[in-house]
Design a protein with these regions (language model features):
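Beta-strand-enriched cores of mature, soluble protein domains
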Residues: 19-142
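Sec-dependent N-terminal signal peptides
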Residues: 4-13
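Cytochrome P450 heme-binding "Cys pocket" and the immediately downstream C-terminal segment
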Residues: 16
Length: 142
């Protein structure tokens, strides 16, 4: 009986403290980029620059620094910067997240802080270094 009560309490508290991140279908958009350049200065960390279409933000330019602080062979972390201009308005964003190698592509997951009404964007995507493409799903965090 004690075990049953323990498991019920454990399950209830797990659900009570769970976080739910939702993609809002009305504000979600696709962003596609062509990788312009990739280089390394030390054989450990890599820098990438890309340009492409960021949905409602139009033409965008992004840069990343990929690091691997835990010396993993299949995942790591990144920081970056994005910039776009829509007419007279300039929108900038700082990018930070994690990546994981899955087969021939890398999956990226990111939380991005923007200057567009201080929106925080949640981003997931696939990077294909062979095809030199980056494809993301982007949505403001609710």
């Amino acid at each position: 009986m004690k075990k049953l009560i323990f498991y019920l309490l454990f399950f209830a508290t797990t659900l009570g403290f769970a976080q739910d991140i939702e993609w809002d279908p009305k504000t979600t958009f696709e962003a596609t980029f062509d990788i312009d350049a990739v280089h390394t200065r030390d054989g450990i960390n890599y820098e990438l620059s890309a340009s492409g279409d960021a949905g409602p933000y139009g033409k965008a330019y992004i840069s990343y620094v990929f690091t691997n602080y835990n010396n993993s062979t299949s995942n790591g972390e990144f920081t970056g910067f994005a910039w776009t201009q829509m007419g007279e308005d300039i929108v900038k964003a700082t990018l930070q997240g994690v990546f994981r190698k899955e087969g021939k592509v890398f999956k990226m997951y990111s939380y991005d802080n923007t200057t567009d009404d201080d929106k925080i964007m949640i981003v997931s995507g696939i990077v294909d270094f062979v095809e030199q493409t980056m494809k993301f799903k982007v949505s403001p965090l609710k």
